[in-house]
Amino acid sequence: MTNLQDQTQQIVPFIRSLLMPTTGPASIPDDTLEKHTLRSETSTYNLTVGDTGSGLIVFFPGFPGSIVGAHYTLQSNGNYKFDQMLLTAQNLPASYNYCRLVSRSLTVRSSTLPGGVYALNGTINAVTFQGSLSELTDVSYNGLMSATANINDKIGNVLVGEGVTVLSLPTSYDLGYVRLGDPIPAIGLDPKMVATCDSSDRPRVYTITAADNYQFSSQYQTGGVTITLFSANIDAITSLSVGGELVFKTSVQSLVLGATICLIGFDGTAVITRAVAANNGLTAGIDNLMPFNLVIPTNEITQPITSIKLEIVTSKSDGQAGEQMSWSASGSLAVTIHGGNYPGALRPVTLVAYERVATGSVVTVAGVSNFELIPNPELAKNLVTEYGRFDPGAMNYTKLILSERDRLGIKTVWPTREYTDFREYFMEVADLNSPLKIAGAFGFKDIIRAIRRIAVPVVSTLFPPAAPVAHAIGEGVDYLRGDEAQAASGTARAASGKARAASGRIRQLTLAADKGYEVVANLFQVPQNPVVDGILASPGILRGAHNLDCVLREGATLFPVVITTVEDAMTPKALNNKMFAVIEGVREDLQPPSQRGSFIRTLSGHRVYGYAPDGVLPLETGRDYTVVPIDDVWDDSIMLSKDPIPPIVGNSGNLAIAYMDVFRPKVPIHVAMTGALNACGEIEKISFRSTKLATAHRLGLKLAGPGAFDVNTGPNWATFIKRFPHNPRDWDRLPYLNLPYLPPNAGRQYHLAMAASEFKETPELESAVRAMEAAANVDPLFQSALSVFMWLEENGIVTDMANFALSDPNAHRMRNFLANALQAGSKSQRAKYGTAGYGVEARGPTLEGAQREKDTRISKKMETMGIYFATQEWVAFNRHRRPSPGQLKYWQNTREIPDPNEYYLDYVHAEKSRLASEEQILRAATSIYGAPVQAEPLQAFIDEVAKVYEINHGRGPNQEQMKDLLLTAMEMKHRNPRRAPPKPKPKPNAPTQRPPGRLGRWIRTVSDEDLE
């Protein structure tokens, strides 16, 4: 697929660089092969936030050159003001002549705070607009979000500290190199003279009808009267030219005109002003011509241009105030933007607006741009350049991935943290051998695997040197270089194998259905949707793939062939196998050059192109057909092959042509056909059956061919027709039955061709096979050995088992494996799958089967208990339950079979109630109501407790009832006037009085009375 030799990791460098530009540049794998050098250029700017805290950054993500974008600040009057252009670090035109942009990513965020600010405020809105800058109608912070409806092209309210990342995705492919406007050698008298070579590829041209008999009338003023004759939106960031003419007519003498062209920037200011006419006198009565021929070089365009206007100044020689001035004008002009229509040059644009950021903060813009560059002659002396690598597989893989980018979650604008988290996912996308674990977590696994299935085969088909045809060189056959192998008739051909297969014991494959397929009467397997590695994909999963040039959406029938060369009359030598399609009409333009010009006539005189001219095709067809090689089939399309395949012959193609002629399907039929007819018109088996089966299986198809077993089609063919809506509704029989040259029992001899060893038709081999068949009929052990061999061959593990046998000569490991493997009926197998015997796939029971087993089990148990009315049918009607107590009592009392789902509650004895004593109720009420020191419970509370005992048939309250009683008691205590008085709260301890001082043992204290 890629140019790497490492088989464990197949990276597509181009898509990796697109999704992760910081990983470096990669050559674009298209067929534009120029010697170039790869270079990564960085862009880093620290932008200061203005007074309003808002601004706008305009990016040109696809521009092939040094220009990256521009920065504008929002003024207090609501208008934007241009700040500066954003460029790459190196001025590319100074060193390089031509350029192609490979990838680009830019990050906008802020992490700095001005003095006095302690919080990082502000948010960012970003949107990618699929148009030019001048086409935006609302560039306000909130209005930007209405520029597109694609959710993957806009994000809003991202914190300025987190930042956003802008990713450049290609808007077109297979593009040429663009001239950079580099300086060219020149000599002039003026030292400031500059000569450059600008891009002339894909210019953008604006045609403006400036005036169509426009009438001007005014009175003379000093300095003249100025009017804007026209103003039109244009887009330019590179050099441009203006050309055209105006014709003026007047009846006033001595009128003088001046004309000025102004190029207006995005902020509304005039970037460039050029006078194209000054003091041009008009002659009355005649046509006065005013031509325009203006060239603006790139170095003068200092900011993006979004409009152009033409101003006319009217005056009069020696005029007096109040004198009348009038004229009429007609004419048009054209504005040519050099390289402006190159994809990515002016559209799309990505706008990143920030709001409410602290004044003086710094918004950092950092990014990388990857280029393919062709150096100028001076630099080329010291810089090695090399050709790009043509890799159509990588290119188509990239196209298919990006065509589904909305469904794969690939955005153009990201929150920076989310983009960083997605890098591992992008690595999975770029690595063809990755297991897609992260993609599976996001739900993208099926889509990417389907794209890989389509894109990978393109390498070997469109670019054979990338993956040569298997065994072609090793076998010494060099038909890829033009030395085609010569068949017996002198013409190289692909033979489908007419010989009878040697083995008559090819049995039908037991596991006939792959995951994602519908099996129809064991006859055909028709995918209703694309199948990729056994995973069913949804219809239309690869809409973008239909845009490839090699994809054909027409009715077709498919058949495989084996490309052979003939060494002698008896020994064909197989080289390769290929799938072919039969399409209606003469379509040699779809064939590879090696097949064109070769055709065979049918019995009715029509032609089949792509067949070797070997006699007459034994068919009567109603029209011409073309046989083309194909590489893949999915949905309702086929992918054509450009391999140098020679013209073909063979019965498989005859069957496919007959099928196409009779039924004319409108879409490719998803079943490959093969078969052979003997001289008597009877169906024979075919050789190369396993090779053809492998060919069909690679495309997710099954091979329908002749076999030794009858297949009863019955009404199932009509079911198949209904499942395939493109077919006519009157197809109620197997199509093979309607082929004009097949025997009546042909349909019953067709089934899915199974894998078999590839035998050569030799007498010795046929006798050996017959001997093996005879031995198998009489020796059961030999029969088992043949069955094991068939099982190994059908599943494609013969070589693996042979290698395993070499490493285990005494079969010790195999015996241990078989001894520990799950056996039919073992406990571990029953626990996981249910019961199953050998040769039968163990599956868990269905819901109906499990219910039937339960009914049988209940019925047998009831029978052992003497309850004979509970039969299996009765249990099923009883909702798969055993008889209830009421049903059993009814049967015991009446000896009549009770009705299912009737419970007979009258026959069930009511529960006996126990009456609680008054003492028990009072004791419980007192315990619940409060402590013994409190007042006795109220009679109302005692009655509540008695009700609980009555409800519980004499038992005490449960937990819920106890909670309710406690709440009731609390309420009654608060409103009870006879409740016990609350205990007085203890007073705080007062400090004791200080005793009087001790005066002596016999001295009495003098009191107040003594003093009186």
Swiss-Prot record:
User: What are the GO BP annotations of this UniProt entry?
Assistant: proteolysis
Q: What class of enzyme is it?
A: hydrolase
User: Which Pfam families has this protein been placed in?
Assistant: Birna_VP2, Birna_VP3, Birna_VP4
Q: Where is this region: Disordered?
A: 970-1012
Q: Where is this region: Interaction with VP1 protein?
A: 1003-1012
Q: Name one GO molecular function term.
A: serine-type peptidase activity
PROSITE patterns xref list: BIRNAVIRUS_VP4_PRO (PS51548)
Any one GO CC term of this protein is: T=13 icosahedral viral capsid
Q: Which SUPFAM superfamilies match?
A: Positive stranded ssRNA viruses
For this chain, the Swiss-Prot or TrEMBL PTM comment says: Specific enzymatic cleavages yield mature proteins. The capsid assembly seems to be regulated by polyprotein processing. The protease VP4 cleaves itself off the polyprotein, thus releasing pre-VP2 and VP3 within the infected cell. During capsid assembly, the C-terminus of pre-VP2 is further processed by VP4, giving rise to VP2, the external capsid protein and three small peptides that all stay closely associated with the capsid.
Record site: Cleavage? A441, F442, A487, A488, A494, A495, A501, A502, A512, A513, A755, A756
Keyword annotations for this protein?
A: Capsid protein, Host cytoplasm, Hydrolase, Metal-binding, Protease, Serine protease, T=13 icosahedral capsid protein, Virion
Residue ranges spanning the membrane: these are none
What Enzyme Commission number(s) apply to this enzyme? 3.4.21.-
The source's domain of life comes to Viruses
Residues annotated for a divalent metal cation binding in this entry: D30
- Peptidase S50 domain residues are 513-755
Q: Where is the composition biased (Basic residues)?
A: 975-986
InterPro entries reported for this sequence: Birna_VP2, Birna_VP3, Birna_VP3_dom1, Birna_VP3_dom2, Birna_VP4_Prtase_dom, Viral_coat
Where is the catalytic site?
S652 (nucleophile), K692
Q: Which Gene3D superfamilies match?
A: 2.60.120.20, 6.10.250.1030, Birnavirus VP3 protein, domain 2, Capsid protein VP3, domain 1, icosahedral virus
Function of this protein? Answer: Capsid protein VP2 self assembles to form an icosahedral capsid with a T=13 symmetry, about 70 nm in diameter, and consisting of 260 VP2 trimers. The capsid encapsulates the genomic dsRNA. VP2 is also involved in attachment and entry into the host cell by interacting with host ITGA4/ITGB1.
Protein name, per record: Structural polyprotein
